[in-house]
Regions:
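Acidic anion/phosphate-binding donor-loop and adjacent secondary structure
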Residues: 14-33, 208
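Nucleotide-activated donor-binding/catalytic signature segment of Leloir-type glycosyltransferases, i.e.
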Residues: 86-102
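A conserved mid-protein helix/loop that constitutes part of the nucleotide-sugar donor-binding site
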Residues: 40, 44-63, 80-84
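A charged, aromatic-enriched C-terminal amphipathic alpha-helix characteristic of glycosyltransferases
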Residues: 180-208
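Aromatic "clamp/platform" in nucleotide-sugar-dependent glycosyltransferases that forms part
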Residues: 103, 122
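Single conserved hydrophobic/aromatic residue that forms the stacking wall/gate
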Residues: 1-11
Length: 208
């Protein structure tokens, strides 16, 4: 396949991992500016398209909200399904509990404001957002359809898309209770997710 289709990680690999490392001051700023103080924030970053499974994510969040009334879902990204997802949020009477941020240039700062990260994709390769979220030391809940290579931190969980909404909700609720975030730069480097190192590794893998 052409190189342009094999290396969708350019933005991340040209940046520095320190951009995503947890920063408490940034966390407080983003949460204060966006009315998220006191909320248990579930984050998702991705284009609004079928692959990313937003409709399923809303069903899961409805179950989470039944268990935790302080839960707030924050969605970064844009795309053709955004309006349909907004309509579903209204039908579920959750429009006040779901924040649609759109495309932003400071996604790395938004990761600081999250309490956990959820990626229920129908399929993925090695998702950059999963690396970013773990760089920010976020507990992550990934679809079991995503490669296990992405789960390099001890707080990464995988749940099958055929599992019940309650199973997903309980896994997310458990993730929300982990609040001891620290600088994980050393761990990420040890797991070969240093930006420069991984860029070279992926290029060698895909361009052989």
């Amino acid at each position: 396949p052409p190189r342009s289709t094999l290396f969708p990680y350019t933005t991340l690999f040209r940046s520095k991992i320190s951009n995503f490392v947890f920063n408490d001051l940034t966390r407080e700023k983003i949460r204060r500016e966006n009315g998220l103080e006191g909320k248990h924030v579930i984050g998702h970053v991705g284009r609004f398209m079928a692959q990313k499974n937003h409709m399923f994510l809303l069903d899961v969040f409805a179950e989470v909200h039944n268990l935790d009334k302080k839960a707030q879902l924050v969605l970064l990204g844009d795309g053709e399904l955004m309006e349909a997802v907004k309509q579903k949020a209204e039908k579920l009477n959750l429009e006040k509990n779901i924040t649609f941020v759109g495309n932003v240039g400071n996604a790395n700062e938004w990761y600081q404001a999250f309490d956990c990260f959820v990626l229920p994709s129908i399929w993925e390769g090695l998702p950059v957002v999963g690396v970013e979220a773990q760089a920010a030391d976020l507990p992550c809940v990934f679809s079991a359809n995503i490669t296990r290579e992405i789960g390099f931190s001890e707080s990464a969980e995988f749940v099958g898309l055929d599992e019940s909404l309650n199973k997903w909700a309980k896994t997310i609720k458990k993730a929300l209770q982990q609040n001891d975030r620290v600088d994980r730069t050393n761990l990420i480097t040890e797991k070969h997710y240093n930006i420069e190192i991984e860029a070279q590794r992926l290029q060698e893998r895909y361009l052989q």
